[in-house]
């Protein structure tokens, strides 16, 4: 099951200092291919190669066990109840373990307000996991 909404930003949105770019959720059964080929081409990735994106994304795992890794964070286990933050232009990869179910929710966003939080150390690439 999948539901994704990619939001078209207009110049007025940027005046708020924070714009939503995408929101959605996906559910996978054990051994399902991940990610779904239905991903938008700008977001699809091979978990063995990883990717970079142009905005922040907060991902919330509500079911399952998997692995997360980024350029600034070594490989670590992620599980139900955890969230992780993806940073713009920061290489990352994540995926469920093959034998695990997986439910993930996410919201993507960008803007000067969140950039300032990162610049002032409130959020850090080296500490992207929350539980």
Identify what each model region corresponds to.
Residues 72-87:
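Short acidic-glycine-tyrosine-enriched beta hairpin
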Residues 75, 89-113:
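Ligand-binding loop in jelly-roll beta-barrel domains
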